[in-house]
Amino acid sequence: MVDYFDYNSLLTRAREQLPEEVFKDVRFEIPSADSFVEGNRTIIKNFKDIAKFMERDAQEFAKYVMKELGTAGDIEGVRLILQGKFGWRMVNEKIQNYVNEYVLCPECGKPDTKIVKEGRIHFLKCTACGAMKPVKTL
């Protein structure tokens, strides 16, 4: 004898077997900056990892962070060393501002973007939806 199931019960059963991550809308979560203050300097230990995760050049990213914090700094290995004392909240806020301005697509909200230069203007080009938005040069 053959058992017949209705569509809704099959769909419910299939959804229950899927992991929780499938239902999350956000797939792009920036790792928080692992920063600490040492003397009169702030050190971000995982700076290059964050830049690699965003698929952006570490030098350009560092330039943005230093400009936003109004300080000087250097990249040494995988760390960014900033002159001055900055709390982890402020550092993470500046990183999130960078993501919103230079990584996430303004149309679809996906992180699949590249910064391309056409003439003298830099654009944030989305590889997912094809949208282009002019961005400030760093």
Swiss-Prot record:
SUPFAM superfamilies (UniProt xref): Translation initiation factor 2 beta, aIF2beta, N-terminal domain, Zinc-binding domain of translation initiation factor 2 beta
Keyword ATP-binding: no
GO molecular function: translation initiation factor activity
Keywords: Initiation factor, Protein biosynthesis
Pfam assignment, any one: eIF-5_eIF-2B
Keyword Chaperone recorded: no
SMART domains: eIF2B_5 (SM00653)
InterPro entries: IF2/IF5, TIF2_bsu_arc, Transl_init_fac_IF2/IF5_dom, Transl_init_fac_IF2/IF5_N, Transl_init_fac_IF2/IF5_Zn-bd
Self-association state and partner proteins as the record states: Heterotrimer composed of an alpha, a beta and a gamma chain.
Annotated function: eIF-2 functions in the early steps of protein synthesis by forming a ternary complex with GTP and initiator tRNA.
Family of the protein in this entry: Belongs to the eIF-2-beta/eIF-5 family.
Name used for this protein in its record: Translation initiation factor 2 subunit beta
